[in-house]
């Protein structure tokens, strides 16, 4: 989201519907910036089925596996005239693609990652890419060249410099300043970062807390005598979100039980 992948905001979280922001982006990018808010992912699925979208280019996301209602997602992808998937594995989504563009892992490219504590960290290439694969930035740059938009060769440091020029809270970030531990945005022009974002007040002001009355599920109350246990899934530390990057390792089947339930059934 920092880099503008949301349909209503550009890089730096500026609203794209604002004329002032449209002018800002147009001047920075050298092309006329879109003036309308784009579609969210679920809306894109519906639009694909309605033939309102002809093609989608997906980079590094296995939507068939991670998004709800997989059948609906598959129908949407099969409704497209062109589906381009840029991936490091032949994912469930990639299997539906018209064209697969083989990318590289984080060990095979230079750049930066930003984690959920706003920490921007350097990524240094450890090994060269496998034959036939390219870093994501190189693929995007090559595609721009093919489409007639001349670009210099992809350079991670130049991309970071462009980000720092456009995104205010990246202003003081350079590859050299990131060091081994990185910096937490917002980063001032002198390189000073921000360890704690909200110390005195929230940027957008106070919010309103909404409460909802809890109600027992009728499915449980009507069937709890015959089915006394509830099976639910959860997240674990080792698997990020839907485990698209980790589920290729051997599975370990684990079932967690409350001690009281286990004791009732003599489970030890």
Regions found by a protein language model. Give the residues of each.
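Catalytic alpha/large subunits of respiratory electron-transfer oxidoreductases
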Residues: 1-109, 143-151, 188-193, 231, ...
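Generic structural signal for well-ordered, non-membrane alpha-helical segments
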Residues: 37, 41, 70, 113, ...
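Short beta-alpha connecting loops at secondary-structure transitions
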Residues: 102-104, 108, 120-129
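Short conserved micro-motifs at the rims of enzyme active sites and ligand-binding pockets
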Residues: 112-114, 131-132, 241-244
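Long, C-terminal catalytic modules of enzymes
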Residues: 132-182
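Long, low-complexity segments enriched in small/aliphatic residues
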Residues: 160-251
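Extended, structured, electrostatic nucleic-acid-contact surfaces
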Residues: 252-257
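Single conserved hydrophobic/aromatic residue that forms the stacking wall/gate
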Residues: 258-261, 265-267
